[in-house]
Amino acid sequence: MTSQFSTAGLTLELLRYPSQQVSNLQAWDAADEHIIKVLAEKVLEENAVPPQPCAIINDSFGALSCALTRMDSSWPLTVISDAKTSQLGALENLTRNQLDAEGIKWLTSRAPLPQDLSLVLMKLPKNLAYFAQQLRGLSQVLPQGTQVLIGAKAKSINSALITLLAEHLGPASASLAWKNTRVITCVSDGRARSLPKAITWSVPEYQLEISNLSNVFAANKLDIGARIMLENMPNGEFNTVVDLGCGNGILGLRAAGLYPKAKIHFIDDSEMAVASSQANWALNTLAPERAEFHWDDCMSHLDETVQPDLVLCNPPFHQGEAITDHIAWQMFNDAKHRLRSGGILHIVGNRHLNYHVKLKRLFGNCTTVASNGKFVILQSVKG
């Protein structure tokens, strides 16, 4: 797959993150190209000098950040992302293209937004509840008349989406299709909306209360994979447990009850997931000193002194819009590297993904703990 991004007279070298992954997936899509095309036409038409403060939201691996920096290195940019890998990927791609990132502000999805924005560029996320929250956040800071350009696949844009935009930010219209994408132009109506509250629900069979922020998987119920995992947790005593890809933290919360001597580390690529886990730890009145929370690309930046004797993992097989197993493979490799001798990796996965093949190759052993028609619980021990 090509790594050369070329549109509107710009040429960039862009790779996904981590760059060493063997993949046929690009670091951008046609919607990125379409946004830049529309923006370039807008800049030429308005001849705006100097460029005005701009926010870039949901920029997968920095295509938009790199393009705007290449167009004008003095462009005041704020890049907002929930995914650690998106932020790390954007930084790598800026460096790869010898672009200066010093002037870029990097914000998480929950951080207060700048008050001086004149333009917003967005990619449409899969999660529309998260998208609605992002729009409502923008409604609190954007003056009336501010344009928000949103790129997406043409098939994802319909009347319901236009209605959602009008409800949460302002009137919107879609461009003509180009490379099977459209760019929506939404104009802020200047009316501030309140942010939605986290969704809270109970898991009575484990005496747990769960609170989910908008971009966390399984927003208002226990997902099937987590349920079978909770029913088949490892027996024994553990001192250090990692909930890898923690989501709302349900596995780590259950581990805290089962293994009272253990310290639990919650790790996720999503900042909202980590925040939800931390909120749920407090919600269930667990001792603060027994937990640590990490916004990270798997265990890439976890302190080397942390040597777990148990890693719990419900790996995703999506990265944004892309279906890929490289995240699971990275999780398994990180677990193998970080587990102490005799430590256990305990995972749940869809049967058709054949994770047992990868685990047997990596650890030299793999045991099927439980299974049903859709999911399988697998366990490997580090020698």
Curated annotation (Swiss-Prot):
Q: Which UniProt keywords apply?
A: Cytoplasm, Methyltransferase, rRNA processing, S-adenosyl-L-methionine, Transferase
Localization (cell): Cytoplasm
- A Pfam family annotated for this UniProt entry: MTS
Q: Which PANTHER family match?
A: RIBOSOMAL RNA LARGE SUBUNIT METHYLTRANSFERASE G (PTHR47816:SF5), RIBOSOMAL RNA SMALL SUBUNIT METHYLTRANSFERASE C (PTHR47816)
Q: Which CDD domains match?
A: AdoMet_MTases
Q: Does the keyword Kinase apply?
A: no
Example GO CC term: the record gives: cytoplasm
Chain's role? Specifically methylates the guanine in position 1835 (m2G1835) of 23S rRNA.
Which protein are we looking at? Ribosomal RNA large subunit methyltransferase G
Q: What family, per the record?
A: Belongs to the methyltransferase superfamily. RlmG family.
As recorded in UniProt, its EC number(s) are 2.1.1.174
Under the GO molecular function aspect, what terms does this record hold? 23S rRNA (guanine(1835)-N(2))-methyltransferase activity; nucleic acid binding
Annotated gene: rlmG
Superkingdom as given in the UniProt entry: Bacteria
- Which classification does the entry list for the species? Bacteria, Pseudomonadati, Pseudomonadota, Gammaproteobacteria, Alteromonadales
Principal location class: cytoplasm
Q: Which reaction does it catalyse?
A: guanosine(1835) in 23S rRNA + S-adenosyl-L-methionine = N(2)-methylguanosine(1835) in 23S rRNA + S-adenosyl-L-homocysteine + H(+)
Which EC class, in a word?
transferase
